Regions:
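Phosphate-group recognition and catalysis centered on beta-loop-alpha active-site segments
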Residues: 1-148
């Protein structure tokens, strides 16, 4: 694996954890509204990824939908299109894909992506989320870093 130096933008700007969320304002963590607010404020953004049933990186922190939506069950048990129709509690936003978030950010601020543990036991990974994330990031021109 090759490593490159962290871009300076990650050290100059505050990084918002799960974007600039504020439940009272209807900006739920990792939501499009929270992403837009962070970009408008000029802050970097950290988001979390889970893999959908059909292999699409989804911007969502938890393994289960229960805490942030009115649905139950695992994120990885549903297809991306279905997840994209599920509203986040207290918001009209739905669960976004990584590709949608990249479009919202458009390279304006740095993006720190956390690859969430897919084994749920902090064990070995099958590499599917990592590979799908790398594929979506191809051609993205903004500053981005990944962590797990």
């Amino acid at each position: 694996m090759s490593r490159v130096p962290l871009p300076d933008s990650f050290l100059r700007l505050p990084i918002t954890h799960r974007a600039l969320h504020d439940r009272a304002a209807g900006r739920i963590e990792n939501s499009p509204a929270a992403i837009k607010a962070a970009v408008a404020a000029g802050y970097g953004i950290e988001v979390d990824l889970q893999l959908s049933k059909d292999g699409v990186p989804m911007v969502f922190h938890d393994e289960e939908l229960d805490r942030l939506t009115d649905q139950t069950g695992a994120v990885n048990a549903r297809a991306a299109a279905e997840l994209g129709r599920i509203a986040l509690k207290g918001s009209t936003d739905t669960v976004p894909t990584l590709a949608e978030v990249l479009t919202l950010i458009g390279g304006k601020v740095p993006l720190l992506i956390e690859i969430k543990d897919q084994s749920l036991v902090m064990g070995p990974t099958d590499g599917r989320l990592e590979a799908a994330t790398a594929e979506v990031l191809k051609g993205y021109r903004g500053d981005v870093a990944l962590m797990s």
